């Protein structure tokens, strides 16, 4: 950097949504290294409600939120929404008794679990969901390549869609190497793909329930899958929800309201969303546990057998948590397909959304012909000031850089989905509103 560039370096701080925490931790470091500025995002962010209140109070230069700003939450100064990245909200669980099996859950069953009417893991609703989708288990608890994880789903009876995610450092060292779906029983390769610039690599191949399969990255086994007979345990379900004001809760509750049960409200507070409200949650006692922030919720699920919660998928694929047995369920979409929480599946769902003139995104939960969509998704926003200032100029540059450069190259590797097409174009237009007046 030149002396002139360093002299013009600015600091800008943000707080709020924990949904994009893993993305922002990486993006701020990369932006600062490239520009000499000092953009920071609080870790933990405090949740979307805090992001909105900090921004309104002038405590930050930009806010972080995954949910709409209400009239009461709105700042008195002019500001804009800037949607900058999306991601899947994983239905995360740990159930050691099913030995690595991926759960398949319909919206109705998720409604029952999080609404407190399904209280045991062997409930017929869960069993029936599992019967409608082949039960494949990953028997490899720890990936042989740290920083590489895999998701297995079966779009049809004899077809597997395997998605491998590589964190940025592993992606960099693995470029040009091979991802392989290998039939261990028949000792032959089913499908391969070459690793390029994207951190998420999907391969589809024909499979049969009598064989077991390995998913390999450069010969290292990152997952080992086979069909299993599922014996769901007679065990109490512990629901883990966000206790802070959370955009992840807001988007999860919106999914519940639109896809399963209109009695759910849409709110940053889970206890205000659930039918029956906070008194209902209190009546469940210790079977409902509140945790503040995405990391704490994910840690609780990873550390506690029999639990289920909701969190951005990067917190589940994290190697340390994954080794403890936390997994993500496949969720039934409006087209009737059980789909895993991959970046591609999130992007497929977001492609069916609408974005208004303010930059706010409205999802369509009735995409009955979209077989590839994962239906529990959030778009996360920065809240930026339109007034001209040196700090606001940096915020505008930072968000423009994320949308145009950083997210397209790195979001998938970090467990997120970059905005593309009309959504990316709208996001860039919103970023230009920051520092425009």
Which sequence ranges carry the predicted segments?
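Conserved aromatic beta-strand anchor motif in extracellular beta-sandwich/beta-rich domains
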Residues: 181-183
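Flexible loop/hinge segments at secondary-structure junctions
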Residues: 8-151, 175-179, 220, 224-437
């Amino acid at each position: 950097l030149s002396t002139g560039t360093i002299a013009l370096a600015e600091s800008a701080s943000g707080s709020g949504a924990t949904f994009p925490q893993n993305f922002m931790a990486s993006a701020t470091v990369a932006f600062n290294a490239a520009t000499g500025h000092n953009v920071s995002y609080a870790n933990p962010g405090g949740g979307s409600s805090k992001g909105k209140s900090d921004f309104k109070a002038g405590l930050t230069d930009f806010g972080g939120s995954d949910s709409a700003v209400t009239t009461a939450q709105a700042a008195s100064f002019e500001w804009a929404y800037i949607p900058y990245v999306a991601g899947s909200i994983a239905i995360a669980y740990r159930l050691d008794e099913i030995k690595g099996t991926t759960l398949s859950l319909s919206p109705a069953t998720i409604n029952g679990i999080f609404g407190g009417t399904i209280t045991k893991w062997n409930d017929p609703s869960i069993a029936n969901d599992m019967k409608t989708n082949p039960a494949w288990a990953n028997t490899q608890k720890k990936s042989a390549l740290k920083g590489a994880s895999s998701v297995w789903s079966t779009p049809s009876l004899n077809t597997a869609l395997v998605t491998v995610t590589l964190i940025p450092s592993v992606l960099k060292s693995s470029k040009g190497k091979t991802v392989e779906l290998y039939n261990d029983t028949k000792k032959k390769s089913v499908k391969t793909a070459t690793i390029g610039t994207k951190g998420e690599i999907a391969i589809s191949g024909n499979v049969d329930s009598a064989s077991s399969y390995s998913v390999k990255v450069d010969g290292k086994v990152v997952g080992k899958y086979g069909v299993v007979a599922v014996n769901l345990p007679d065990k109490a379900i512990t629901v883990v929800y966000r206790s802070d004001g959370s955009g992840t809760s807001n988007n999860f509750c919106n999914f519940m309201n639109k896809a399963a049960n209109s009695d759910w409200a849409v709110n940053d507070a889970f206890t205000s969303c659930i039918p029956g409200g906070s008194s209902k949650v209190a009546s469940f006692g210790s079977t409902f546990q509140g945790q503040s922030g995405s990391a704490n919720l994910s840690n609780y699920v990873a550390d506690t057998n029999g639990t289920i919660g909701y969190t951005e998928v990067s917190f589940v694929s994290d190697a340390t948590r994954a080794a403890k047995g936390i997994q993500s369920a496949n969720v039934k979409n409006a087209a009737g397909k059980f789909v895993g929480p991959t970046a591609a599946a999130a992007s497929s769902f977001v492609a069916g959304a609408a974005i208004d003139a303010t930059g706010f995104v409205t999802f369509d939960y009735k995409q009955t012909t979209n077989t590839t969509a994962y239906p529990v998704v959030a778009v996360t926003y920065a809240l930026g000031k339109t007034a001209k200032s040196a700090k606001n100029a940096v915020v505008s540059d930072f968000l423009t850089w994320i949308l145009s450069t950083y997210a397209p190259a790195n979001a998938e590797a970090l467990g997120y989905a970059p905005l593309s097409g009309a959504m990316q174009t709208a996001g860039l237009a919103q970023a230009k509103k920051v520092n425009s007046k």
